[in-house]
């Protein structure tokens, strides 16, 4: 069995707050005249958070895997069976879908079968566009896959823009996972010292002597769409 692992790398400042480096090349979504309230919504009900946290107490103590922050809703939404297309006055078009995870702290997504020809753009953002990931281009896609950073709040809107010159070119996008964040990055950072798993190496020990420059920074990885490693 071939197992695909989508890993997202996010950089954090370890202070009172955790600030993620925003993914993408910058830019603004093209849906200026489309109100978020009008976009078709797919609602995911809240998972059993109490049961998940009870499992986390055991997993965190044993340190046998990533620190789980979210619940993965496995899905197979794509441009054919979900969302809606909008025509633009410039001759281009946009595919949009709104994903809502009830009572989530964050929402992050895993894309499969993603094709972004030159000139097309992908964005993921929250409902008031105060947090925007993108633009994503073909340069951000690896073997048809892309995992996003965590969008704050319980809503993530996906917008795929097709440039006018590309309307005859086939495009593809599937949403494989919609992750409901029930724990936060702040909880992970505040878990304290001496809590690393047995797969980690302490850079302040002799084994880490060769990593003197790197230890001044910190990297947080999103593993399996719903866990943190650092």
Q: Which residues does each predicted region cover?
A:
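Domain-level representation of secreted and single-pass membrane ectodomains enriched
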Residues: 21-230
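Bacterial Sec-dependent N-terminal signal peptides
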Residues: 1-25
């Amino acid at each position: 069995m071939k197992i695909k692992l989508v890993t997202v790398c996010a950089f954090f400042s370890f202070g009172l707050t955790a600030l993620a480096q925003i993914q993408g090349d910058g830019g603004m979504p093209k849906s200026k005249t489309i109100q978020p309230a009008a976009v078709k919504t797919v609602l995911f009900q809240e998972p059993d958070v109490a049961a998940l946290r009870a499992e986390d107490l055991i997993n965190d103590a044993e340190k046998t895997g990533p620190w789980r922050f979210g619940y993965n809703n496995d899905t197979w939404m794509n441009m054919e069976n979900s969302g809606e297309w909008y025509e633009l006055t410039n001759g281009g078009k946009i595919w949009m879908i709104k994903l809502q995870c009830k009572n989530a702290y964050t929402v992050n997504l895993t894309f499969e079968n993603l094709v972004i020809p030159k000139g097309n753009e992908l964005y993921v953002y929250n409902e008031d566009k105060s947090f925007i990931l993108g633009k994503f281009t073909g340069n951000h896609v690896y073997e048809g896959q892309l995992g996003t950073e965590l969008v704050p709040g319980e809503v993530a809107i996906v917008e795929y823009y097709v440039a006018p010159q590309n309307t005859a070119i086939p495009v593809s996008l599937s949403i494989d996972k919609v992750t409901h964040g029930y724990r936060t990055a702040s909880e992970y950072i505040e878990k304290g010292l001496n809590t690393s798993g047995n797969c980690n190496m302490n850079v302040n020990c002799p084994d880490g002597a060769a990593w003197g420059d790197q230890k001044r920074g910190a990297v947080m990885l999103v593993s399996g769409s719903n866990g943190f490693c650092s």
